[in-house]
């Protein structure tokens, strides 16, 4: 499944991106709040509905108020819910009360985990998917947690896997170098993603060694595939 991103400040630019990927045969769209613009819930919903009308594809919403400075509120969800194309949401607010609200009040919108350190809670509340950057270089651990919880329903084992993954999640989310860690993780997995773009700088040698150690301890199976750059 190919999902095309439509993130842009102006609605016109998001529409252009949406129609372009629709013409390329993409299966769905990822629709965010326009960054920096700080729209009201009504303005934000009108933006999403305009993108929907232009492309007419299934849409995954992406709620990340920490980066976008605006929440996809209940008013917003009520407005966009008038279109059946809005079928899922990647929830990255970190607010567990929003997870409860989505599960209880919007059962027609599939929940996708967008906050790694809450993955277990998301699965317990009915999320069946997890959009996570760390899976690019450590897919074994991420798939194991998803399968254990979502497919097998074994939350006792799921808690053990989650506990083993938490050091990696802390490294990615709390170290202030999320993108750099993802890129280096891909590089040591044999999937070079290039250096981070300015103004971001690459990890230091100590930071690289720290990430390697976290992966090694968390996921020995994954680590056997790593090819450490010289």
Predicted features and spans:
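Catalytic alpha/beta core domains of metabolic enzymes, predominantly
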Residues: 67-163, 172
